[in-house]
A protein has these predicted regions:
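Start-transfer (signal-anchor) and selected internal transmembrane alpha helices
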Residues: 1-31, 130-134, 141-142, 151, ...
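Membrane-interface transmembrane helices that cradle and orient dolichyl/undecaprenyl
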Residues: 8, 141, 182-198
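Signature aromatic-anchored transmembrane alpha helix within multi-pass, membrane-resident enzymes
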Residues: 22-25, 220, 226-227, 241-250, ...
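Short acidic/glycine- and proline-prone juxtamembrane loop motifs at membrane-interface regions
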Residues: 42-43, 161, 167-175
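Interfacial juxtamembrane loops and adjacent helix segments
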Residues: 61-124, 265-322
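Transmembrane-helix motifs of polytopic, lipid-linked glycan transferases
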Residues: 123-143, 181, 185, 349-353
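Short hydrophobic alpha-helices at membrane interfaces in multi-pass membrane enzymes
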Residues: 152-153, 188-206, 368
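Short helix- or helix-capping micro-motifs
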Residues: 152-157, 184, 205, 209, ...
């Protein structure tokens, strides 16, 4: 179904369209699996995977407060096939989740189960990356037809940065999936606001809240959509808000009590309540406190408030502490293919003339910009990955590029299809093929270091970008191999908690410059 209700039938034959998507999906999965198998655990993966495994094994969420539990538990579910060691160390009993992550990672490295555990967890995220492509296809198709859906999905599947992030068991990909799913469900509700679709929207919103706390931004957006859509029918608007709120909260509770039926034990409850008490001045914590919410989830909001302090960051040769408003736009230029960025901008310019442009702005751009703004005002420039949902939603605009080519070259109602007009179908196929060829070339040449890839001329990447724009600790195993071939080298490398370089290496940070020389 096309949202505008007037788009012509697709020009790219369905067998070609589905064949292209199948090939790109196989490449995405194949490259993702290769890197999931070879890369060392990322910095955030240690905490996320260990806490997810603990939640499933002990039915206890004491190790989950910093971020919601759902994506961790989903990734941990197949990871149990590796038979991970789940130590009940002092850190476990004290609820020190970072220290317990150290214990988990170290114990599984010693037992030889670490790599298998993380590989199984990462396969879940690879599958979620494919699901994101499917949602982008569905979203763009509703506005621009199947050809537009093909372009949007292909852009996601072939961009090196997305491929690089798409195999790490962190929260960025799952939350992007949740955000896109909520946008699609909301579009369907706008087309026909039935009670069943209202409840479905509430369910997806609840899952988004159980995936990342910034899902609260999406909750505000959903409220505004319902109010605007039903503004002439206030009783129905109130009914819709009640249904969305009730179902979303029930889903949130279902996730948390499904994982921890008895709730946190008394000592953990006291610790979580103390964490919340330290953030009483926080508006977000206060609003969440007024909700009927699981304590573990509220403690996560408070924990994020504690973590939201100025941190060192750098980009394009500049370094600072805190946040910069220009960080994410510049990071996008330094990490994403120039052709893709130009196409996205051109697509949204063309989309301004779309008959459904207001709905496109309200249902695609509004949540994308809202999520972007919330991250922008935080003093944490941790990498482009934290605005991944916004970047993914921006890809929907690529679908608009198919329409002007088709309109210019298609036969008019009277004029015969002569001259250039006879080239319409080959031209559309050629444009799409050229974009895809350049994207696939970047995708293939970036492997097996997709995350570290940057487009020319911003190479080598580490001279231009830092943090998760280039490195999340995935190269630790390669650094270890390098250390073995050198005599006590000085090393500075990020790695997940519980892992060290070893091999006789010396710490570069804090070393005497005379010794390094």
């Amino acid at each position: 179904m096309v949202d505008a209700g007037h788009e012509p039938s697709p020009w790219i034959p369905a067998p070609i369209r589905w064949g292209v998507l199948a090939v790109l999906t196989v490449l995405f999965v194949g490259i993702g699996f290769q890197q999931a198998r070879l890369d060392a655990p990322a910095v955030d993966e240690g905490v996320d995977v260990s806490s997810g495994v603990a939640a499933l094994v002990h039915r206890d969420l004491r190790m989950v407060p910093e971020h919601p539990a759902l994506p961790k538990a989903l990734a941990a579910l197949p990871a149990l096939l590796a038979g991970p060691v789940v130590p009940e160390s002092e850190a476990w009993h004290e609820g020190e989740w970072f220290n317990w992550s150290d214990d988990f990672v170290a114990a599984n490295e010693d037992a030889g189960s670490l790599d298998a555990t993380f590989l199984w967890a990462r396969l879940v995220v690879v599958a979620q990356g494919v699901a994101i492509a499917a949602l982008l296809y569905a979203l763009a198709s509703r506005f621009f037809g199947p050809d537009g859906g093909l372009v949007a999905a292909a852009a996601w599947l072939t961009t090196p940065y997305f491929v690089g992030l798409g195999h790490f068991a962190m929260l960025d990909v799952p939350f992007t999936l949740a955000a896109l799913a909520l946008v699609l469900v909301t579009l369907r509700w706008l087309a026909r606001p039935t009670l069943a679709r209202t409840a479905a929207g509430g369910a997806v919103l609840g899952l988004a809240l159980a995936t990342r706390h910034t899902g609260l931004v999406l909750a505000v957006w959903v409220v505004l959509v319902v109010v605007v859509k039903l503004r002439s029918r206030p009783f129905e608007a109130l009914q819709g808000l009640v249904v969305v709120g009730l179902v979303s909260v029930l889903c949130l509770w279902a996730v948390y009590r499904g994982l921890s039926p008895s709730g946190p034990p008394p000592e953990v409850t006291a610790r979580f309540e103390g964490l919340v008490a330290t953030q009483t001045s926080s508006v977000a914590v206060g609003l969440v406190g007024a909700m009927p919410r699981p304590l573990e989830w509220q403690a996560g909001v408070a924990s994020m408030g504690q973590a939201g302090t100025n941190r060192p960051a750098s980009l394009a040769g500049q370094s600072w502490s805190g946040g910069r408003w220009w960080y994410f736009p510049v990071a996008a230029v330094l990490k994403l293919p120039a052709g893709l960025l130009a196409a996205v901008l051109a697509g949204w310019v063309v989309a301004r003339r779309h008959p459904a442009r207001l709905r496109l702005a309200g249902v695609v751009l509004a949540p994308a910009l809202s999520l972007w703004f919330v991250v922008l005002v935080q003093p944490l420039n941790l990498g482009l990955r934290v605005v991944l949902p916004s970047v993914a939603l921006a890809l929907v605009g690529l679908g608009a590029l198919v329409a002007p080519v088709r309109a210019r070259l298609a036969p008019g109602p009277v004029e015969p299809a002569t001259g250039a007009r006879r080239l319409a179908r080959p031209a559309v196929l050629g444009v799409v093929g050229l974009v895809m060829a350049s994207q696939v070339a970047a995708m293939v040449t970036a492997a097996p270091h997709s995350l570290a890839w940057s487009p020319p001329p911003f190479r080598p990447a580490y001279r231009w970008v830092s943090d998760s724009n280039v490195d999340v600790g995935q190269a630790l195993y390669e650094v270890r191999d390098w250390v073995v071939r050198h005599d006590q080298p000085f090393v500075a490398v990020g790695s997940t908690r519980g892992l060290t370089v070893g091999g006789g290496s010396r710490e570069l940070v804090g070393a005497d410059p005379a010794d390094v020389q």
